[in-house]
Design a protein with these regions (language model features):
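Acidic-aromatic/histidine active-site loop/patch
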Residues: 131
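Short, hydrophobic alpha-helical segments
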Residues: 135-146
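Class I S-adenosyl-L-methionine
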Residues: 1-75, 86
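A helicase ATPase "motif cassette" and its flanking acidic/Ser/Thr-rich regulatory loops
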Residues: 127
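Short, flexible loop/turn segments with low-complexity composition
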Residues: 16-18, 144-150
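Generic alpha-helical structural context detector
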Residues: 30, 67-70, 100-104, 136
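FAD-binding beta-loop-beta segment adjacent to the flavin cofactor pocket
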Residues: 74-113, 118
């Protein structure tokens, strides 16, 4: 959710139009990843189960569009169960680099923290492309008001 406010009643802000996505999750995957990202035989039944209690959901693997990363819900049962992909016949989780790509970060962006911290940070990040588009619309609104100074 994005909220934009102006202290000027003459401001005529319009959110950017939706853009058609031209990439799928599969396009953002790394061709080779470390073994640590693959799920062990011990955890696999839990991931592939339909959940328990009020958290029942059919597990889906290899989605074209990733589910929200849910960093703030990481301790909730199966909160992020669907962000898994298959590679070489095995199921794995997304790497921090792949999560960064999902949020619009370039591959040149340095990830100087542990994987667990990176997952939290990218899960809580604001998508780069959306932020840029909203900021450009804010700038256009200020320009139209004659209040923009470079």
């Amino acid at each position: 959710t994005y909220i934009v406010c102006f202290d000027n009643q003459n401001a005529r802000f319009e959110f950017p139009e939706k853009k058609k996505l031209n990439k799928t999750l599969q396009d953002l995957l790394e061709p080779e990843v470390d073994d640590k990202y693959f799920l062990s035989d011990r955890i696999l039944p839990t991931i592939l189960s339909d959940g328990t209690g009020g958290y029942k959901a059919k597990s889906e693997i290899d989605l074209k569009i990733a589910r929200p990363l849910c960093a703030t819900m990481a301790k909730m049962h199966r909160a992020c169960q669907d962000n898994y992909v298959t590679q070489k016949g095995k199921i794995r989780r997304l790497t921090p680099r792949e999560c960064a790509r999902l949020q619009g970060f370039e591959d040149s962006f340095v990830i100087p923290v542990s994987d667990s911290q990176a997952y939290k940070q990218f899960g809580n990040a604001v998508t780069v492309n959306v932020s840029r588009a909203v900021a450009q619309s804010v700038k256009s609104t200020f320009i139209n008001l004659g209040e923009w100074v470079d």
